[in-house]
Amino acid sequence: MAKLVYGMNQSLDGYVDHLAFRPSPALFRHFMEQLRDLTGSVYGRRMYEVMRYWDEDCPEWDAEEHDFAAWWRSQPKWVVSRSLKSVGPNATLVQDDIEAVIRGLKAQLVGEIEVAGPNLAGSLTDLGLIDEYRLYLHPIVLGRGKPFFSGPRPPLRLVSSDLIGEDVIRLTYVPA
């Protein structure tokens, strides 16, 4: 049975913003190591559209960015959206009965399935489907933006904390 994991970069005041958190080389390596073990990823529409940046190679990328793009293209993806009509390679569009689809993925697959996007994570949290939360806490205060938890915070239990690089702390929680 697969485990559903939601993890994102977060400011000290609880906000996520992909433009505010350029990963350090150490954090990028950490993410690459984590990604290699993923079974697949579930994206909300907005996060999927952001990640489509990696569909095409850019000549200015370094070797690590090319590696990430290759991983992105090869990785199975499920995109939850009622407004999209189609998705790119290795992606499946999920428009109806999200709960049944995600429960089916968890039952049929093994390993970890990443959840990307706070709105989708909020919906999956409400359904009791997320098995683990990973908060990558950065020493920055944004003051506004999209919160890590888009709805009421679920009761959680801390299972680990790790320093990644010089200034990012990963907090890992499971539902209490």
Short names for language-model regions:
Residues 1-176:
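Enzymes that bind and transform nitrogen-containing heteroaromatic metabolites
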